[in-house]
A protein has these predicted regions:
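C-terminal catalytic histidine-bearing segment of alpha/beta-hydrolase fold enzymes
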Residues: 145-182
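Hydrophobic/aromatic beta-strand patches that form the interior of the parallel beta-sheet core
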Residues: 2, 79, 119-121, 157
Length: 182
């Protein structure tokens, strides 16, 4: 992702997102569509086991993993790290849009992954999205998963750490088992 504060001007993500919203889309929708097209291409590789596809992402990647897993049923397991939170507290332009509060927050997006497997982790000392900011969303998601018979498809973990993947091997081992359907 382009960060003009770091890399200089020449690409204005917010301006591009506003233009896409005016056309009925968003930068997130465009980039998730790019991921879907990448998967279309990858599926044609004979070495790809199309029954064992998973997506994993950290931070912005966690957002894309969650949206991609929600929108593409070819993804069997989704792992989103250090992104799930309360969008009222983290109201950034590329994932909050007009009337968002009446439609989709993180719980609603995550619920679209079901009945496939979903692994979400949050860090207790995350500088960007502290675990405490997303506790209400977590409760909503767990209640939804239980109500719809998908509690066994959800793993939600709060770990000791910062804005990083959980370094405990259980996280990746769980994801690999989920991808394998174990």
């Amino acid at each position: 992702l382009w960060n003009s504060a770091v890399y200089g001007s020449g690409y204005d993500r917010e301006w591009l997102n506003r233009r896409l919203i005016q056309q009925g889309g968003s930068i997130t929708a465009f980039e998730v569509q790019c991921l879907k097209k990448m998967l279309d291409w990858w599926e044609n590789d004979p070495a790809t086991d199309t029954q064992r596809l998973g997506v994993i992402g950290l931070s912005y990647g966690g957002m894309y993993a969650l949206h991609f897993g929600a929108l593409d049923t070819r993804i069997y397991a989704t792992y989103s790290s250090c992104w799930f939170s309360d969008r009222k507290k983290h109201n950034w332009c590329d994932w909050t849009y007009f009337n968002a509060e009446r439609t989709f927050f993180d719980t609603e997006t995550a619920s679209l992954v079901f009945p496939r497997r979903l692994y979400i982790e949050v860090a207790d000392e995350d500088e960007a999205f502290p675990a405490s900011d997303g506790r209400q969303e977590r409760l909503r998601l767990e209640a939804y998963a239980a109500k719809t018979g998908n509690a066994d498809k959800l793993t939600f973990k709060e770990f000791k750490g910062k804005h990083e993947l959980d370094l405990d091997s259980d996280a990746l081992e769980t994801f690999v088992k989920d991808v394998k359907g174990e």
